[in-house]
Structures are given as structure tokens and as C-alpha cells.
Amino acid sequence: MKRILLMSLLAISTALSTQKPVELELWPDGAPNSNGITTPEQKLENNRISNVSEPTLTIYPAAKPNGLAVVACPGGGYIRLAMNHEGHDMADWFNAQGITYAVLKYRMPNGHHDVPLSDA
């Protein structure tokens, strides 16, 4: 009986566990162009961020992948990024469908239109 209970708990905890997200630097050897932003990245209300000069890709692997993946590029009018409600908050739903999900934190253009396109 104890063995059945232990095996059941193990199976349930394995099924409910999600893999941890992995954050990768998009340009580990330096970006191909600069947006001229030298001030530190700012965290704003509701987990919005601005002054992005170091782009990253956060990957949420699905526990049971089906071969599909989605990359979210949160909006914010090229002034800030809405990282939660247009990014990270959707990971659980996609992972439940077997879809690997990624969120791109891209650089702000700061007058250089090619910078965010380089990150995409």
C-alpha cells in the first residue's frame, strides 16, 4: 500500500512539475549594432522594462514537447516592453499544449530602427 501511494505521488509530482526556463544572451559576443543606450535597464510598473541594451531569449521548454515552438516579442511601442502579460504569463498555457515557448527581450531602437530588427 505504501509503495502504491509513493509511486502515485511520484507520478503526480512528475506530471505537475514544469521545466525551469532558460535565459540565453542573444549576442554573447556583442550585438552587431548599437542603440546608443548607456543607462541601466529600468524596471517599470507591472513588470514593464525600458532602456533594454542587452537582449535575451527566455525559453520555457514543454515537459512533453510536440515539436512546436512559439516566440513572443512583447509590445510596448518601442519605448518599453510589457514582459508579463504579453510575454512570460503565457508560458504555462503553451507548455500545457506541449508547445515550447520563448520570450524575446529585444533592444529598444532609440532612433536606430535596425536595432530591434537585428534582435528578431
Regions flagged by a language model, labelled:
Residues G67-G76:
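Short beta-strand element of the alpha/beta-hydrolase
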Residues P61-A63, A82-H85:
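Non-catalytic cap/lid and distal C-terminal segments of serine-dependent acyl enzymes
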Residues A69, N95-A102:
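A fold-wide structural signal in alpha/beta-hydrolase
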Residues G77-I79, Y101:
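Serine-hydrolase catalytic-loop signature spanning alpha/beta hydrolases and amidase-signature enzymes
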Residues A82-M83, D89, L104-A120:
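Catalytic nucleophile-loop/oxyanion-hole region of alpha/beta-hydrolase
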Residues M1-P21:
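Bacterial Sec-dependent N-terminal signal peptides
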Residues Q19-P65, H113, L117-S118:
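N-terminal cap/lid segment of alpha/beta-hydrolase-fold proteins
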